[in-house]
Amino acid sequence: MKIITRGEAMRIHRQHPASRLFPFCTGKYRWQGSTEAYAGREVQDIPGVLAVFAERRKDSFGPYVRLMSVTLN
């Protein structure tokens, strides 16, 4: 499965009313300048996960990326 843009993920989320947004993993990844830098990268294929997208977050150590998923579980 590939990481897609947030807009594409929200479109999938709206198409499936039973879906919800959930963190894909617990890790934090270094910020690379834009979320498009992460689009197209391969991630593990997990049953029930419809899409994975990168989301920018910020804490006391600075900006980072968190992978979020659109899931049916």
Outline where the language-model segments fall:
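Acidic, low-complexity, intrinsically disordered interaction modules
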Residues: 15-73
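Short loop/edge segments at beta-strand edges and connector loops
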Residues: 5
